[in-house]
A protein has these predicted regions:
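Substrate/cofactor-recognition hotspot
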Residues: 418
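Membrane-embedded transmembrane alpha-helical bundles that form the catalytic cores
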Residues: 1-415, 423, 427-467
Length: 468
């Protein structure tokens, strides 16, 4: 189930809010947990048991790690079991495809099993691992109540596509939290804002992108390929940041505060800067649980470069089982290392700032082509024909309408300038007896109304990060 569905917006969300607020405090966590399991089972009934098993497994390891102290073998066993579960469900098909041709000469073959990927397995496995590692490090005590552990892993706003919430960031909120009218109001607005980003912008761009990628790049005009690359760059941002906005807003409605997951990433002036602003919860997770344990930048220049490349290779693998994701991770690792070597010093100079921004946007845009393509070959073909003039066979005129251009202009402005102007305007209006409240609510209600109108009239409503 997705947040941007009519049944969630008009039936399930009002029901859980009503039930939560009329229930006594001792029952609130239980109600959220049961609803979260129901929410997951709605879209993934076969694998809700797998998620419950993952929760109980890591709950047990947390208790054991705390009881027996810093036993590295115990932590290693926990990490290994989690990765084996993740590896089987997410990577078995890919590994079988890659290894079976190599094993054919030895009369060995991995069984041809089409394993279905459970929704959100990368996200909830990452959270579970952060919990056990935090207990091992002594940063927090093991959770004694399995129901609270279940809520931490399965809480429906962030279960399927993040943000990835580290246990030490939310431990106190699980035990004790309050909801204020101001916080609830902010949550509603944030949810509507995210819904608009997803339904109005991301879905519109997705239809064009999917249509173009269905053809050979050689059959599509050069201008259309560039436009498609730009549209996908915007689609994935508004799709994923929209979901994060909705998750953060829902969390606020129930008294939880999640970390921000995006900070205008397309205003970045380097690839390092981009990763400080894009999918922040994942970048933070890899830094805390992979990069720093590997030694970070404390063991010399060469080791730092190896650590960086390792992290970005794993980032690519985390996103998906395929050569395109692996290449995408290596690609970003290359530019991070390049900036560490020498390029970063130039990019930081004020006189190069406009060029630095163009460089960052261009590198990210090309990278997204590999992320979106079905194969490495398709990605390179797409890029090749972006730069090689050729005659188009396929005309995409039916997508080139006023609606697309209007939404494209709005999206480009929303990636940076509009938000900057909004903060300045909001600050001035706030001084005028709070009139911003009425004005902003009118705007949010307009976004909600238009989003619902589009949902009713269009069944095309995918979420990119549900695949991970």
């Amino acid at each position: 189930m997705v947040f941007s569905s009519i049944i969630f917006l008009w039936v399930l969300l009002p029901c859980i809010l009503l039930l939560y607020y009329v229930s006594p405090k001792p029952f609130k966590n239980g109600i959220l947990t049961v609803f979260s399991l129901f929410f997951y089972a709605w879209g993934e009934p076969r694998y809700v048991v797998l998620m419950i098993f993952s929760v109980l497994l890591n709950y047990g390891f947390g208790r054991l790690v705390e009881k027996f102290g810093k036993k590295r073998w115990l932590l290693a066993l926990c990490v290994t079991l989690n990765l084996l579960i993740l590896g089987y469900f997410k990577y078995y098909n890919f590994l079988a495809e890659v290894l079976n041709p190599l094993l054919r000469g030895f009369d060995i073959a991995l069984p041809a099993i089409q394993v279905t990927l459970p929704i959100g397995i990368s996200f909830y496995t990452s959270q579970a691992l952060s919990y056990v590692v935090d207990v091992y490090r002594g940063e927090n005590q093991a959770q004694k109540n399995p129901l609270n552990m279940m809520l931490y892993i399965s809480f429906f706003p962030q279960l399927i596509a993040g943000p990835i919430v580290k246990y030490h960031d939310i431990e106190e909120q699980i035990e004790n939290r309050t909801v204020t009218l101001e916080g609830f109001s902010y949550g509603v607005k944030r949810f509507i804002f995210g819904l608009g980003k997803k339904v109005i912008l991301a879905n519109t761009f997705a239809e064009v992108v999917d249509a173009v990628y269905a053809y050979q790049a050689a059959d599509v005009s050069q201008a259309m390929l560039w436009l498609t690359a730009l549209l996908y760059m915007l689609q994935i941002y508004f799709d994923f940041s929209g979901y994060s906005d909705m998750a953060i807003g829902l969390g606020k409605m129930f008294g939880f505060t999640f970390i921000e997951n995006f900070r205008l990433p397309y205003t970045a002036t380097s690839i390092q800067d981009f990763w400080r602003k894009w999918h922040i919860s994942l970048s933070s997770w890899f830094k805390e649980y992979v990069y720093i344990p590997l030694g970070g930048n404390r063991r010399g220049t060469a080791r730092t470069y190896v650590n960086l490349w390792t992290v970005f290779l794993l980032t690519g693998i985390w996103h998906g089982a395929g050569w395109t994701f692996i290449f995408w991770g290596i690609y970003h690792g290359f530019f991070n290392v390049l900036e560490r070597c020498f390029l970063g010093k130039w990019l930081k100079q004020e006189k190069f700032r406009p060029l630095a921004h163009i460089y960052a946007v261009f590198v990210v845009l090309i990278g997204w082509i590999f992320f979106r393509a079905d194969t490495i070959g398709q990605a390179f073909s797409f890029i090749r024909y972006m730069f090689v003039p050729h005659s188009a066979v396929v005309l995409m005129e039916r997508y080139m309408n006023r609606k697309l251009w209007m939404f494209l202009a709005a999206a480009l402005l929303a990636c940076g300038p509009v938000q900057w102007f909004w903060m300045k305007w909001k600050g001035r209006v706030l001084a005028q007896d709070g009139s911003v409240t009425v004005t902003s609510w009118i705007g949010y209600m307009a976004i909600l109304w238009f989003s619902i109108l589009l949902l009713v009239n269009n069944t095309y409503n995918p979420f990119i990060y549900f695949r991970f």
